C-alpha cells in the first residue's frame, strides 16, 4: 500500500480531523503491502481496513444545516455519509407545494433515511400524520434524534425501524460506506469497494402499513427505497394504491422497467411525480 493508495481511500471523508485520524491508521499498516502478492489479497486487505474504520467510527455523527422552504433545519447523519446534501438537492423535484394538504392528511414515507422529507413536511404542515419507515438502525436512531433536534411534535411523525417487502421476510441490508441513503436489500452495489458490513432487518408489506395503522386514505406516498419499489408496489393491493392520492419519489434500475412501473402506478394513483435515478443497476 502506497501513500497514493491511502489518499485514494480517505479523500472523500468530509472532516479533516477524522480524515487525518484514518490516514494515520493506514500509515501504521503500510507494511502490509509488502506481503500482498495478488489483487485478491489487496482486495481483502482494503475490505478489512474499511471494516476497522467503520467499527471505530460507526456511532460518530455530524450535523448538517440547511434551509427548506424558508425554514431552518439541522440533521444528524453518519460522519462518513454525503446523503443529506444529495437529498437536499432533490427536494425541489418532489414539488410538495403543489399538494393541497389538509388537517388530518396521512403521509407514508418509505425510505425515510434520517428524516429530511418527513421533518420538512411535519414542520411546514404540523396538522399531518406521518408514518415513516427506515430499516437501517443507525439511520432510524438519527431520525429520532432529528425529530427532537428540530422540535417536532412526536405525535406528528411515527417512525418504524422496518423495511417494506412483498412477503414480510427478514432482509439483509447492504450499505455503501459513504452513503447512508444507499442501503438496499439486493446487494447491488457490487462495484463498490467501500461497503459497510451487512445487517439484518425485519420487514412488513405495503398493505400491512394500512392495516396496522388503520389508514383508509393516504394523501401522499413518498417512496425512495433503492430498488425495493418494484416488489413493494407490484405486490400491493390495488385498492390501497387507489387510496393514495399523490406519489413522490425515485425509481431505480434500467429505463424500461422504471417506465413500466410508473405506468402501472399511474393507473391507480391520481398524481405522480417521480425522479428516475441515474444508476445502472439491473433490477
Where would I find each of the regions flagged by the language model?
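Glycine-rich adenosyl-binding loop in Rossmann-like folds that engage adenosine-containing cofactors
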Residues: 70-99, 160-208, 212
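Active-site segment flanking the S-adenosylmethionine/decSAM binding pocket
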Residues: 100, 106-118, 125, 182, ...
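Conserved SAM-binding strand-loop segment of SAM-dependent methyltransferases
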Residues: 153-161
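Short, hinge-like loop/turn segments at secondary-structure boundaries
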Residues: 148-150, 174-179, 239, 265
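Hydrophobic packing residues within well-ordered alpha-helices of enzyme cores
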Residues: 121, 143, 147, 171-173, ...
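Residues at the starts of beta-strands that form the adenosine-phosphate
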Residues: 129, 156, 246
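S-adenosyl-L-methionine
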Residues: 1-127, 131-136, 141-145, 151-153, ...
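Feature marks short, surface-exposed loop/turn motifs that line or immediately flank catalytic pockets
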Residues: 139, 166-168, 229, 255
Amino acid at each position: 500500500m502506497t501513500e497514493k493508495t491511502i489518499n485514494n481511500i480517505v479523500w472523500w471523508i468530509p472532516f479533516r480531523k477524522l480524515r487525518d485520524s484514518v490516514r494515520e491508521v493506514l500509515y501504521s499498516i503500510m507494511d502490509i503491502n509488502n506481503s500482498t502478492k495478488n489483487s485478491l489479497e489487496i482486495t481483502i486487505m482494503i475490505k478489512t481496513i474499511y471494516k476497522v474504520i467503520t467499527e471505530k467510527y460507526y456511532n460518530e455523527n455530524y450535523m448538517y444545516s440547511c434551509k427548506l422552504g424558508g425554514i431552518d433545519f439541522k440533521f444528524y447523519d453518519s460522519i462518513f455519509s454525503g446523503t443529506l446534501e444529495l437529498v437536499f438537492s432533490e427536494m425541489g423535484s418532489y414539488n410538495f407545494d403543489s399538494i393541497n394538504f389538509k388537517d388530518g392528511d396521512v403521509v407514508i414515507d418509505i425510505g425515510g433515511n434520517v428524516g429530511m422529507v418527513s421533518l420538512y413536511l411535519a414542520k411546514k404542515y404540523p396538522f399531518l400524520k406521518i408514518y415513516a419507515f427506515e430499516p437501517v438502525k443507525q439511520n432510524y436512531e438519527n431520525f429520532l434524534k432529528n425529530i427532537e433536534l428540530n422540535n417536532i411534535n412526536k405525535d406528528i411523525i411515527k417512525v418504524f425501524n422496518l423495511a417494506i417487502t412483498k412477503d414480510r421476510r427478514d432482509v439483509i441490508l447492504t450499505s455503501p460506506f459513504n452513503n447512508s441513503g444507499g442501503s438496499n436489500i439486493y446487494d447491488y452495489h457490487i462495484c463498490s469497494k467501500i461497503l459497510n458490513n451487512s445487517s439484518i432487518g425485519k420487514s412488513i408489506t405495503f398493505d400491512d402499513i394500512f392495516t396496522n395503522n388503520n389508514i383508509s386514505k393516504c394523501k401522499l406516498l413518498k417512496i425512495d427505497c433503492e430498488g425495493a419499489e418494484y416488489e413493494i408496489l407490484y405486490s400491493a393491493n390495488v385498492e390501497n394504491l387507489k387510496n393514495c392520492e399523490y406519489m413522490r419519489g425515485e425509481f431505480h434500475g434500467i429505463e424500461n422497467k422504471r417506465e413500466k412501473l410508473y405506468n402501472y402506478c399511474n393507473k391507480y394513483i391520481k398524481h405522480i411525480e417521480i425522479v428516475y435515478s441515474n444508476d445502472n443497476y439491473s433490477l
